[in-house]
Amino acid sequence: MGLELPLILGTSSVFRREQMERLGIAFQAASPDFDETPMLGESAPQTALRLAEGKARSLTGRFPEALIVGADQVAWCDGRQWGKPMNLANAQKMLMHLSGREIEFYSAIVLLNTVTGRMRRHIDKTVVVMRQLDELHILRYLEREPDAVYCSCALKSEDLGALLIERIESTDPNALIGLPVFRLVDFLKNEGVEVL
């Protein structure tokens, strides 16, 4: 039955769409309609998983018979959650603060089968240690990588953001970009979708 269901990626992120396209399987991207406001007292992994689940569930009305992928990422450093800076000034401040620090990125992924109601869930933790950065390097990076303002912690690790990183600890290098591909492939296989 899984083979007959369309695959929907619940995201407005161009980066997650690009990751999915690299898998070479047919899918449709749809922007979820879901309130992503943080909840008081929620841990970073809890937030990431709640948002991934909410994104997937928000699309069930539009896609009542589908496999829906929801994903979200939350960064944690210095006792607080960090998001996307969304503009140059915020990105500069954020990167200056994160210089030389260790950041934990929690990338959650869910696969919802809307026919059976089964939802598979996973959270991938990636630890990133940032290099010591100065204002000049940050400005150069943001000039050459303007889309970084739409990335968690302004860190576009798949491109020039890699130059800001001293070390990465992860079981899935794709997770830092936003989509834990290794687990997604397992989830799809369990639903009868062969990627290879």
From Swiss-Prot:
Role, per record: Nucleoside triphosphate pyrophosphatase that hydrolyzes 7-methyl-GTP (m(7)GTP). May have a dual role in cell division arrest and in preventing the incorporation of modified nucleotides into cellular nucleic acids.
Cofactor(s) the protein needs: a divalent metal cation
Keywords, ordered alphabetically: Cytoplasm, Hydrolase, Nucleotide metabolism
Single GO molecular function: nucleoside triphosphate diphosphatase activity
Family: Belongs to the Maf family. YceF subfamily.
Site features described as Important for substrate specificity, chain residue numbers: 15, 73, 158
Keyword Cytoplasm: yes
Protein name in the entry: 7-methyl-GTP pyrophosphatase
Subcellular location as annotated: Cytoplasm
Gene Ontology biological-process entries: nucleotide metabolic process
EC number(s) stated in the UniProt entry for this protein: 3.6.1.-
Active site per the UniProt annotation: 72 (proton acceptor)
